């Protein structure tokens, strides 16, 4: 006998209605393509009709690529990894995103790669914000002219080729002339100045990068520094991206009203990586086989350095790009490009380096196009005469090689010049404060070094700076508070010089 089953139509209809409501009818349109060819860090993909230039692509093995060439029948993409397991015929998915990186205060003191992932073994970095790797540079209205000094701690630069906050100053020279040393010294000198530093190593040896990081650690500079490193064994794509990552990390702080300093070491390697990518993508080569848009590669990076207007918080990004020359040839393609983009250049000479003049800065052909506006008054008061005397000395020195008998005035001028040249020499990783620099230059241009033998000059100056900081604090205080070389400060400095010179000459 069949039992009566109570069918409740209301309950059934409510269940059906609930199921209908839960049914997700959303249709996702995913842009998918197929790999035609892969190799040398480049993939050619069929399909992907809706892809954007610069869009991130995801391959089956989770390798990420960037679509760079959008051609009529295929897309050329560069891979941000080895991509060894990508096969012909495998599928590729367009992500709809442009390359971006996480940013934040927690990056300070860390070493990261071009994708802002930590490579220093200190664990993950927690951040909540992100920025596009390629951000537009601030416009004309968003900027103001450079007016604050960015002290490097090197006498030759701070006195004669001064750099301001928001400036772009190129460091150019042959290999092994101390370009990285100048940049690293500048970062060390920012200690206590409330400046965030970003050091970008592009295509360097891993041992060189480790050495720089150790220097920062030893000198307590890592706490305000971020290191972005893509070494020589990294793929061309990552070497090409590294400078933009460094700029994005610095921009985060700049738009928060902070001062930042970015060192790109070096842009020649980035240009070579970009040339490799472009040639493999079959883009037409131009001068020195670089692609036609290699100027834009560097201009869009360096234009992001700026001094922001008061409405945007007066933050700044100072850029120190480094470019390597071959046998001092500044007229090659990349050097001329970067010289024309930047606001001046510091030229390092192999001849001066080999002659023992270090930092090997050729003051004659180095310039700073906006720096004088950023010099403090005290430095301006003493630096003008220094530059003039060194220029006259360089001219006389060339002439003196041919002349046998020189008059007394010329001999004195040559002797003074040699002592001034000694005064500009500085040991690596020993930046000087502005007060010490002003005192040092004043000593040289006012003849206090003329009585000494040339080889005694550096010992005299080192000991004098120690004497000044322990016995004549009033002089340092006047310069710190007024930023001007007042009559009172000059009197104090003269007193110190007379006292110390007597002491030094009697003990020598």
UniProtKB/Swiss-Prot annotation:
It is a peripheral membrane protein. Belongs to the ATPase alpha/beta chains family. F-type ATPases have 2 components, CF(1) - the catalytic core - and CF(0) - the membrane proton channel. CF(1) has five subunits: alpha(3), beta(3), gamma(1), delta(1), epsilon(1). CF(0) has four main subunits: a, b, b' and c. ATP binds at residues 173-180. The record marks 366 as: Required for activity. It catalyses: ATP + H2O + 4 H(+)(in) = ADP + phosphate + 5 H(+)(out). Produces ATP from ADP in the presence of a proton gradient across the membrane. The alpha chain is a regulatory subunit. One of its GO terms (cellular component) is chloroplast thylakoid membrane. It comes from Chara vulgaris (Common stonewort). This is ATP synthase subunit alpha, chloroplastic. Keywords: ATP synthesis, ATP-binding, CF(1), Chloroplast, Hydrogen ion transport, Ion transport, Membrane, Nucleotide-binding, Plastid, Thylakoid, Translocase, Transport. It is found in: Plastid, Chloroplast thylakoid membrane. It is an enzyme of class 7 (translocase). Pfam families: ATP-synt_ab, ATP-synt_ab_C, ATP-synt_ab_N. Its EC number is 7.1.2.2. The keyword Ion transport applies. One of its GO terms (molecular function) is ATP binding.
